[in-house]
Structure formats: C-alpha cells, structure tokens
C-alpha cells in the first residue's frame, strides 16, 4: 500500500501526519511512504531526513495525491484536497464530521473512504489510535503554561523577607482529558486549584489530584 502525508495548510499548524520514524515502521510492514515537500519542516523534520529514512518526497500535493492509496493529514482536508482525490482512495485525518457535513458529503459523493481520527472511541482496544486524547492532554497542559506566562506573578505561594505572596487561584471548567491535564499542571505549579464539571461523580478524581471540586448550589455532597 502507498501512504502519503500532505503538508498542513492551516496557518500556524506545525504538526505532520507522518514522521521519519513512523514512516520507518510503516515501511517495515511493507508499505511505501510518500510525503509532500516541506511537510515536516515546521515540526523539525527536513526533506532530507525523510529521504534518509527511505521516504519518497514529492514536490506538490496534487502529485502526492495521484501517487498514493492512502492520504494522511492532521487537520481536516480542504475542499480542494478532497476534490483532487479519486474514488477508492482513503483519507486519514481529524475530520469532525458533525461540523463538516458538507465536506463529508463531498467525500462520500466522490467515493472516498474517510477515517476520522477524532471519532476513535476511548476504549482499551483503540488506545494506540486515540490521537484526540493525546492532543487534548497537550492542550490542557499548554493552556495552563500560557496562562501562567500571562498571569504576571508566581502561581505558587512565596514567603520572603518582605512578606507573603499567596498562591494563584485557578478554576478549571470541565474535567475531561484536557481539564484533568490542566488540573495536574496547575497543582504542580503550586496554584490553589478549583474545578467544575457537570458530572458530580468526577469529584473524587479531581480531589485525588489535589484540587477542590466546585458543586452547583442545588447539589448536595454525599
């Protein structure tokens, strides 16, 4: 099977669907791997690093799409990218079909098989393919780091000769994968952390991480 990774066109997107290392694993399984020129540049992978791994680097998206059976991306494809694909080809990417119903209809009309990585269920059997949770974990961590950078003072409390500085108070709304990552990061930075979720049953998990669960006024703590 011929697998190709497109360069991401979204402004600021630095990720790439296939790295030289992952390409090596695919080739060991007997597949041919292609990447569009410059696809990995913003992720720190030069075209030469792909060539050294045995990957074929092609100059354009159109040529890559014509050359492969499976097209891999990180973000959802554009209408133009879908338009260049042929019946029988497979697309693997984040797709968000509920938000991109017209794009999904276009793919269906052209006879393209679309595998939406954002729809992979969070079960043990699919854990290695759960790219969405991995990205959510990073997003939760990064959100707190960015907030701390813009906060203007320490997250943790300080005791100095000049007096005390109280810890920052952080409220995390939502205790999904990203929220739990944000809670863990905030606690590790020394903040006083509060968290809310519409599911009161997650209170124990939140409190086990060192945060305080915020109940709605009508809820009773058992």
For each predicted feature, which ranges?
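An N-terminal-biased, well-structured beta-alpha scaffold segment characteristic
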Residues: 1-106, 110
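Glycine/serine-rich phosphate-binding loop and adjoining beta1-alpha1 elements at the start
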Residues: 2, 8, 79-169
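Generic secondary-structure signature for well-ordered alpha-helical cores
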Residues: 28-32, 55-56, 70-73, 109-113, ...
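NAD(P)-binding Rossmann-fold cofactor-contacting core
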Residues: 34-45, 189-216
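Solvent-exposed alpha-helices and their adjacent loops that cap or buttress functional pockets
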Residues: 63-65, 83-86, 161-166, 185-187, ...
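Glycine-rich Rossmann-fold phosphate-binding loop(s) that bind the pyrophosphate
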Residues: 174-176
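N-terminal Rossmann-fold NAD(P) dinucleotide-binding loop
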Residues: 179-180
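Conserved small/polar residues in nucleotide/adenosyl-binding loops
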Residues: 219-222
């Amino acid at each position: 099977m011929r697998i190709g990774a497109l360069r991401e066109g979204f402004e600021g997107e630095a990720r790439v669907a296939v790295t030289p290392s992952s390409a090596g694993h695919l080739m060991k399984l007997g597949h041919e791997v292609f990447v569009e020129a410059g696809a990995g540049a913003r992720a720190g992978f030069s075209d030469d690093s792909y060539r050294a791994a045995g990957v074929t680097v092609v100059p354009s998206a159109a040529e890559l799409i014509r050359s492969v059976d499976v097209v891999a991306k990180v973000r959802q494809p554009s209408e133009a990218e879908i338009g260049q694909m042929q019946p029988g080809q497979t697309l693997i990417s984040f797709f968000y079909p509920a938000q991109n119903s017209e794009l999904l209809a276009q793919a269906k009309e052209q006879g393209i098989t679309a595998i939406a990585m954002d729809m992979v269920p969070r079960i043990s059997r699919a854990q290695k393919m759960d790219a969405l949770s991995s990205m959510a974990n990073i997003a939760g961590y990064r959100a707190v780091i960015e907030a701390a950078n813009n906060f203007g003072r320490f997250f943790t409390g300080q005791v100095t000769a000049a007096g005390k500085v109280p810890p920052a108070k952080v409220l995390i709304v939502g205790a999904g994968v990203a929220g739990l990552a944000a809670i863990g990061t905030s606690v590790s930075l020394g903040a006083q952390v509060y968290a809310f979720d519409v599911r009161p049953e997650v209170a124990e998990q939140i409190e086990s991480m060192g945060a305080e669960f915020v109940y709605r006024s009508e809820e009773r703590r058992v």
